[in-house]
Amino acid sequence: MNGFGVAAHARLRPDKVAIVHGDRRITYSELDDLVARAAVVLERYGIGPSSRLGVALRNRPEWFVGALGAARLGAACVPIPSGATTDEREYFCTDGEVGFLLDEAALPEFMRAVAAVDPVESPGPHRAPDYVALRAYTSGTTGRPKAVLRPETPVQQSIEGLVRYYVAYGLDSPDEINITGSPLHHLAGFSGPHSALLLGHTTVILDHFDADEWFGVVAAERATYAWCAPVHLYRLMSAADAVKAAADVSSIKRMLHGSAPCAPSLKREVMEFFPAGAVWETYGGTETMGTVITAEEWMQKPGSVGRAAPGSTIKIYDDDGGELPPGEVGLVYIGSDWGRGFRYAGDAELTESIYRGNLATLGDLGYLDDDGYLFVVDRRKDMVITGGANVYPAEVEAVLVTHPDVAEVAVIGLPDDEYGELVTAIVVPAGEGLTASELIAFAREHLVRYKAPRRVEFVTELPRDPMGKVRKRTLRAQFS
C-alpha cells in the first residue's frame, strides 16, 4: 500500500474525483484530507511503523481511508474478509499481530474521530528499511491461510512499474475510470482500485458484483476498465437479454480478467459483447504476477495466458531445477525486475522452496511455446478456485471433520458453469441421519461463506493409494 500517491494527485489535480461509491463522490483533495486525519487517529490508537492495521470492512471508501492512513505511518495493512467468522477473525488478528481492527462495528467511532482531528498533525513517513506494506493471506496447504508479506518498493520504482503495466494495457490517460465489484479484502479486489489511486485515475466501487448494476454504472460513469474474475464474466453474460441489449459498454477500453481459468466458450462470448480488442487476460496470484495477453493474441494462441508482462520474467523448470525448452511441460516460475516481491511470514523454508533466484512458482504446470507464450496445463494439485477465490481443501476438511457425524471427508473442486469450480465435500458419515444441508450450515458457522461446501456427497469409503493417501483425482472423475 502507498499512502503518499494520493497526496501527490491532491496537489496536482485536487478537484479530480478519486472515488465514486453510490451517490458519494470524493475528490483527491478530500481523500488526501481523510487519509491524513486517519493517520493521526490511527497513531493515537497505537498504530505506528512496522505495526499492523486489520481492515475488515465491506466495499466502501473508508477501506482505503484506513489502509492508506496506516501506510502513511509505515504500518502494514492486513485485509480480512468482512464476512469472516469469529474464529477466522481471531486467527487473522492473532497470527497477523493486528494492533487495531477496523471493522464495521468500529467504523462509526473511527470516522467521528477522523472528523474531529486536525490533519495538520498528520505524521510524515516513518518507515523501517524493511517496511512491509501488505500482509495478505493466501490459503495454506496445511489447513490455515498463510501470510504473504509484500514489501513496499521505493515509491518511484513502484509508480514506474505501474505505469509500465498500464501503458502496456493501453490505459495511459489520466482520465481513466476503473470499476470494481470484487471484495476489497481480496488482492484481485483492491489491487485495481489501489493502482487507480496511485495513478490518479477515478475508481468506482460497487458494494458487491451485480450484473445489472455493473452495466448501469459503467454507462453512467463511462468506466474505461475493469478487473474481473471469470465468475463475473459469466454473470454479465447471464444477465437478461433485455439488460444486455440496453447496456452501453462503449466506454470500456479494457476488460482485464484473471485469478482463475476462463472457459474458451465464455471468453469468446465476452469478446463478442464488448468493444473490439477490449478483453485481455493476466496470470499470477496473491504472491506475484507475470503475464498478459491481448484479445488479438488470444485468438491466435487460444488457451494461452500470454507472454511476460513488462518487467516480468517467465521460465519453466523440471523437478531437478533444469530450465526446459519450449514445448516441454514443467513448473512455471515468474518474477519481476524488482527482485523478490514477497515472502511467507515466519516460514523462510517455505519461501525458499518456491523460489529459484528471484523467480517464484505458484505450483502450476505449463509450457512456453516458441514465441514465448505461456500455456498452463494444470493448476496446483488440490486447490479449488471458486468464483475467482482460492480455497485449499485442507482448511475446509479441518473444519468438517470436527462434526460429530463425520468419520472422514475429502474436499475437491468440481466443474461449474458459474463459479468455475464448486467446493464439494465427499463424506464418509460416522452414523445415520447426517444431511448435506446440515453439514453446509455447520461449515458456514466456522468458515467464510465462499469456503464452505456448496455440494455434499456421501460415500461408504474414500479411495486411497497404497500409502493411504486419498485419490482425489478418482473422486473428481466419479462426481464430475
Q: Where are the regions that the model predicts?
A:
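Conserved adenylate-forming
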Residues: 42-47, 122-130, 135-179, 199
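Conserved AMP-binding/adenylation subdomain of ANL enzymes
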Residues: 156-177, 185-224, 239
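ATP-dependent adenylate-forming carboxylate-activation enzymes
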Residues: 57-58, 78-91, 105-110, 201-221, ...
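Structural core segment of the AMP-binding/adenylate-forming
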Residues: 40, 44-45, 49-52, 65-68, ...
